[in-house]
Amino acid sequence: MAPRSSKGKSNNKGKGGDKKKRDDKLLAPSLVEITVTTPYETQVILKGVSTDKIIDVRRLLASHVETCHFTNYSLSHKVKGHKLNDNIQVLSLKPCFLRMIPEEYLEESQALTQVRRVIDIVACTTRFFSKSPNKSIVAGNANPTPAPDGLDMVAIHTTPKLSQFYEFFSIHHLSPPILHLKKVDGEEAGEKRDGDYFGLKVKICNGKVIHVIASVKGFFAVGKQLSHCHSIVDLLQNVSNAFAKAYESLMKAFTDRNKFGNLPFGLRSNTWLVPSPVSESASPLPTEDEHWGGNGGGQGRNGEYDHRPWAAEFSVLATLPCKTEEERVIRDKKAFLLHSQFIDTSVQRAVRAICNVMDTNQQTSGTTDLPAGSILLEDHVGDLSIVVKRDIASLDSKPEATFQNDAFVLSSEELAERNLLKGITADESVIVHDTPALGKVIVRQCGYTAVVNVKGQTQKAMSDFRDILIDDLPDGGANALNLNSLRVEFHRPHSVGTSVENQPTQLDWDDLESYRCIIQELVKINLTKLEETRVSSVRPIRWELGSTWVQHLQKKETDVCGKPATNDETELSVKGLGKQFKDLKSKSKKSENISAVNEKDTRLHELNEEDDLGQKSIDGLFTELKELLSEEAFSRLKETGTGLHLKSKEELTNMAYGYYDEIALPRLVADFGSLELSPVDGRTLTDFMHIRGLQMRSLGHVAKLAEKLPHIQSLCIHEMITRAFKHLLRAVIASVNNMAELPVAVAASLNFMLGRRELEGCDRIPGEEYCLRLQWLQKFLSRKFGWIQKDEFHHLKKFSILRGLCQKVGLELVSRDFDFDSPNPFMSSDIIGLVPVCKHVLCISSDGRTLLESSKLALDKGKLDDAVSYGTKALVKMIAVCGPYHRNTACAYSLLAVVLYHTGDFNQATIYQQKALDINERELGLDHPDTMKSYGDLSVFYYRLQHFELALKYVNRALFLLHFTCGLSHPNTAATYINVAMMEKEVGNDHLALRYLHEALKSNKRLLGADHIQTAASYHAIAVALSFMEAHSLSVQHEQTTLQILTAKLGADDLRTQDAAAWLEYFESRAIEQQEAGRNGIPKPDASIASKGHLSVSDLLDYISSDPDTKGNVAHRKHRRARILQVNDKVASADDDAHRVASQIDIVTWNNVAEADVTKSRSEVNDPDTVVDKTNIETGDIVVHRLNVDRQTVEESTLDEGWQEAYSKGRSGNGAGRKSRQRQPDLMKKRMLLNKHHNRNQDVQQQNIYSPLQKTSKGPSLSKSSPRRALKNAEIDVSTNTTKPQLKASGAAAVTSTTLASKSLSYKEVALAPPGTVLKPMLEKLELNLERTETQIYRTSSASSGEESKSDTVMLDLPIEGTELHCEKQESQESAESVENLTSESEGDLGSYRGKKTSDISRTKLSASAEPYNPGGFLVIDLQSSAATIGSYPIMVADPISWAVVSCGIHSPPYYSAIHSNGVGTPRSMNPDAPEFVPRRSLQNSSQHAGEDASVSVDSSSCLKAEKDAVDLKKRELASFIVKSSQKEVPAALSKTSPEAESGGTSEKDSAVTEIVYSREEENGANANETNGGEGFVIVAKKRRRKNKVRLTNVAAGLYHQPSSVCA
């Protein structure tokens, strides 16, 4: 339930309510355009959001290529003045024009920051790519043993390698502008003048060395007659042209990598993998290089907070007022800042203490005589007590009891009871009020454990403190303490001051084998102990269990009390008290019952006696719990209404255990099954369990319950084995006394755990080591987790285990490929260092986290207004408490991005998600689950903005990381496959897209079951893909399966079920039309296709593309709509209505030609203001009128960076909008009735008119809400040579568009919008556009005879500039040689079509030779855009899963998210300069036909030329395609086959499609690689090929969500 906001509290309810509404309205985010004037007097336009402050503007400038090198400057505003404070809201700056003012370097550190920034910018050219060959022993065999029974999906993409981990950030193909930079002082720096700080020797790209001096006024070159330059970049550009060109190339590479930001600098070493160049060099990454003023982040690095009165301030913290939300925000901020400062200080103090002990032990060898677990150091610094102990060199249970406060040592039973009472009485302040837990930190490193506690005077000191004064975190919370910066490095002197000797780079095999023997002995000893020890009967309890238990009981009571009253109503008040108090009733209730029924007198008397006895017992219980709890805590427990305050400690403990076993664990597995939770690694699994109070020792139980969920069971098994190996590795590290031998010991341990020594000798019998390892694992997992291991070890994902092991122990490895099939995959040189592993409580805003959960819940229910409101409030709270760039705030950015994505604000969604990604990469880690989620989400948002190649880059990065976490056998990976398929299709890789979809379906069936709703989503995706290939019968079969699953799982009344029913109805209509077309003489694919056996996808596409049309007036009438929809499928842009009300005779060929013309002209016309007058195209009997609509009337101007203007109004309508997705097929049909002169924005808005957002009825009515009936009526009129239906549709469009423009768009309408389209009702512009637009329909009689004598010619309206329609002549009865003559036809040959039969006009299907389609102005209905929600990862928008909400992150289920692409068409506005949208061949081809005759009169000569070039290009490509496909696929007898004989080809075609879709992926992939798209295809600009086709899947499906980000 959403928390109530206290801001609206008032004695006057009306005023309070109005205030709340105003607050909500103000909180609604919106796009903000910020113009900044640079020191070069140029203007930079930044895309921000309304929640931004000046500090966000600085971050945006740091991510812009023109200003990224500036560090020391201030911002000024003509109204607000100079040196604006970082906390000033951007919305308060009106006008939003800022100016950068360079400031003097008043301190040397500021000059060092400038140098560090420049080094950081150029680091991507050298620091993330190693030129040395890979050190992998057998790099080609680095793949683990495949899982049994094909549990993993087929790796369609290239198998990722660890050595490629940092290539995503590398720009190594460019020469670095700076080869070397050295700081010089003293005599080498030359004469030092007043104001000079230090000298620099800069070796630039051409080898020249430039001597630079840093001073207060800036930088200047020695010996050059130049004034000071504010930045080094400016100075070097002035001095050297070579540097200027190299730097310009680097900035261009940044833009090509991602024009919207996310520049690859500022990264930190925060991942378990270290770049090879960094591991080989002597300096860390520039951000953390202390030589240039960098550091590992955090506070108190110099000990400035060591003597802070921690005890007193933590005590004061617990007393701060926290009754209202405003009070809690103030309290939470102080608690967060104080605790963050305490954690940073304590961790650094603990690491320093451990290093001191290590140095002492290395000099004296003192640890050899000390017993294990003895205290080696005890120190007090102010209120901090630091105790360092040596870890026990055995595999005994971990001494987690040390985490409790030493002031009062509790037994296991007492600790469990204490935690349970803490949980059942928990409120928003539970963390802050637990001062002992808040003031404790445990740090492990190199076999030592340091415990830091706060011990000091509290009561006496509290009198001196009334409040806590503490500064905000620097840099908005960015640059938090990076634990990896505190590493102990093994191969060179490390930063923390220990004296570890340098380790030789060559592996000492003798030492490796000696340590391997030690490890084996250690395992044997532990194996014996495991046989002797017994499992403890005391079960620990986490306090979170009590909190979730109370919530469960409260929900249960609410559900029961919500039912109709019964005779037992009086017993409901004591529900949940257990059997002992089951019959207790209040005396007032009993007196009423006595007077009601005399027959119950005896029973009531007994109840009175029981009441007396019970009351005495209750009084005793009251006394017991009151003694244990404070009065406030006891009151809270009593007010919960659960009756737990009546229980004793023992009863509470037993009931909690019952809840744990019978409800909590099964519910967790149920959430896993429904994909409400979808963990991808051990970290997210641990977070999910801990947040629910579940112990990790229950992993074995979870694995048993998840027997039908292979991915969850596998994840549990991997986590259990990882934890077992963790204990073994810690024991080995603790047994090493000589730190120089530690790398060898670690490498030997990893080889023992992950190396392969299964078979030995000629008989290939299992080796001794293998048997010992397996036996120990089985026994350890059985005792520790209750899991009986079988043969899982043979099929482990060793990469996942290695990753988890490094994170749990603190290992840093070099990023290279490890051969796990060898006995020794690791060398000592692979072990870079050990980083500290910390354990402490998390202190964040509980209200903020509650708001995040409320936002996710509202999103799941389709209440977008509430989701936006809660998400924005959560973000505001997180920023207020943690700062805008703290790692805790990133999850709020990410969730709000997903919510805004669902509302259609793709630009805002992208901005917020980029913020989240930048934070996650730098603060959490490059492979953190939240970082993976951001990659997946951002790829979907880029996809919606029509940047398909950029989207592919980021989705492939998410897929790369998923490979090393959960592997291919996971629903999130399957959902990502669906996203990849969607994006691959947009760049022309249809065959690859189908393979991804096929693997996703198989994976979901295997992992989730054939009846899971996510499997239904995959079936739907395949159905849509088959529909693209006109295998409509198969589409019906797949959609029937989808409907059956959803009906069984969700019921017939669910919106998703009704949506599937509407889709099925659509597919059935297409199949019927196809059959009717066959019966009326229109040829279908050769029936012999079924006899060809397995075909590759490319063969299938070749074959389908070669199908010709034949005759039949009725057939044309029936087939017209199918072809129109096919065009829509292929283009997936904005409704090209001109192709729908087209002529029966020429519509098929004309549609294809028109698409090519539109593509070319749209890509060549960049001026949005261009208006082309109506053009007549006369070709004998055919008269076609085209009206070009001024795009400016509907579209906003295209922004420089490719962003579109977004409107917050598009987010309204969470109620009615919810229903729109159920009628997606009807929407498409209705939209075909619209006049074809509206652009796609108008069409999107017209959806409201033609789809009244009502549930799909089984029998469509004749009203406007039934598009199918309306379409059929229109078709009937066309068949009778009547143009009234078209005219009526035009009139309806004109009326309803105006009506719609004044309405707010709903949630589901946004889902139907094309990718990148921003939906904003614009009444005035629509009316203006409608006034300009006309539809003229001319009827002529065809000169053909026979059954084709009657044919209508219908005008085609194209909403684009400079586009002409042309007919292509093909004779289906002619041989392939005659078809080849098409290549010589010019544009003037259109007149030759006069008198031809319509049967002579053939069609092309899924033509791979089509010119790359520019998604500029059409709106084509997306066949799968009926639903609009993102899965929780969906897309790593978080848990990818279909309607099921994946917790913590983006919640859009994969069916709607992954399968139903919200976007069908092109965005309303795009950057025409975007590289991925520039056609590669259109210009060069157009020049070849400049001299051809034109048979069409055009008002504009430039328009004519563009149209001629496009038409001729299409004719040449079409002819080439038809010749190839006809020669290879179409039997010679096909031309002589009668229509009657061909009418039965549909089923054969569909069966053949089945063979193709489900077989021979390998052949398909090989063909694709050889022929670039399949045999028989004309190669076109691949990057832009058919970009506007319908999305196979919704963005949401690919999004992958990590709940941990929200539930941390």
From Swiss-Prot:
<dbReference type="InterPro" id="IPR025697">
    <property type="entry name" value="CLU_dom"/>
</dbReference>
<keyword id="KW-0539">Nucleus</keyword>
<keyword id="KW-0677">Repeat</keyword>
<dbReference type="GO" id="GO:0003729">
    <property type="term" value="F:mRNA binding"/>
</dbReference>
<protein>
    <recommendedName>
        <fullName>Protein REDUCED CHLOROPLAST COVERAGE 3</fullName>
    </recommendedName>
</protein>
<feature type="region of interest" description="Disordered">
    <location>
        <begin position="1531"/>
        <end position="1552"/>
    </location>
</feature>
<dbReference type="GO" id="GO:0005576">
    <property type="term" value="C:extracellular region"/>
</dbReference>
<dbReference type="InterPro" id="IPR027523">
    <property type="entry name" value="CLU_prot"/>
</dbReference>
<feature type="repeat" description="TPR 1">
    <location>
        <begin position="848"/>
        <end position="881"/>
    </location>
</feature>
<dbReference type="GO" id="GO:0005829">
    <property type="term" value="C:cytosol"/>
</dbReference>
<feature type="compositionally biased region" description="Polar residues">
    <location>
        <begin position="1242"/>
        <end position="1265"/>
    </location>
</feature>
<feature type="compositionally biased region" description="Polar residues">
    <location>
        <begin position="1535"/>
        <end position="1546"/>
    </location>
</feature>
<keyword id="KW-0802">TPR repeat</keyword>
<comment type="function">
    <text>May act as the scaffold of a protein complex, which sequesters key factors that are required for the G2 to M transition in meristematic tissues. Together with REC2, REC3 and FMT/CLU, contributes to the establishment of the cellular volume devoted to the chloroplast compartment.</text>
</comment>
<feature type="domain" description="Clu">
    <location>
        <begin position="288"/>
        <end position="564"/>
    </location>
</feature>
<feature type="region of interest" description="Disordered">
    <location>
        <begin position="278"/>
        <end position="303"/>
    </location>
</feature>
<feature type="region of interest" description="Disordered">
    <location>
        <begin position="1194"/>
        <end position="1226"/>
    </location>
</feature>
<feature type="compositionally biased region" description="Basic residues">
    <location>
        <begin position="1"/>
        <end position="12"/>
    </location>
</feature>
<dbReference type="InterPro" id="IPR033646">
    <property type="entry name" value="CLU-central"/>
</dbReference>
<dbReference type="InterPro" id="IPR011990">
    <property type="entry name" value="TPR-like_helical_dom_sf"/>
</dbReference>
<feature type="region of interest" description="Disordered">
    <location>
        <begin position="1"/>
        <end position="22"/>
    </location>
</feature>
<dbReference type="InterPro" id="IPR019734">
    <property type="entry name" value="TPR_rpt"/>
</dbReference>
<feature type="short sequence motif" description="Nuclear localization signal">
    <location>
        <begin position="1217"/>
        <end position="1224"/>
    </location>
</feature>
<feature type="compositionally biased region" description="Polar residues">
    <location>
        <begin position="1373"/>
        <end position="1385"/>
    </location>
</feature>
<feature type="repeat" description="TPR 2">
    <location>
        <begin position="890"/>
        <end position="923"/>
    </location>
</feature>
<feature type="region of interest" description="Disordered">
    <location>
        <begin position="1466"/>
        <end position="1499"/>
    </location>
</feature>
<feature type="repeat" description="TPR 3">
    <location>
        <begin position="932"/>
        <end position="965"/>
    </location>
</feature>
<feature type="region of interest" description="Disordered">
    <location>
        <begin position="1238"/>
        <end position="1292"/>
    </location>
</feature>
<feature type="region of interest" description="Disordered">
    <location>
        <begin position="1369"/>
        <end position="1400"/>
    </location>
</feature>
<dbReference type="Pfam" id="PF13424">
    <property type="entry name" value="TPR_12"/>
</dbReference>
<dbReference type="GO" id="GO:0005634">
    <property type="term" value="C:nucleus"/>
</dbReference>
<dbReference type="GO" id="GO:0019750">
    <property type="term" value="P:chloroplast localization"/>
</dbReference>
<feature type="repeat" description="TPR 4">
    <location>
        <begin position="974"/>
        <end position="1007"/>
    </location>
</feature>
<dbReference type="Pfam" id="PF12807">
    <property type="entry name" value="eIF3_p135"/>
</dbReference>
<keyword id="KW-0963">Cytoplasm</keyword>
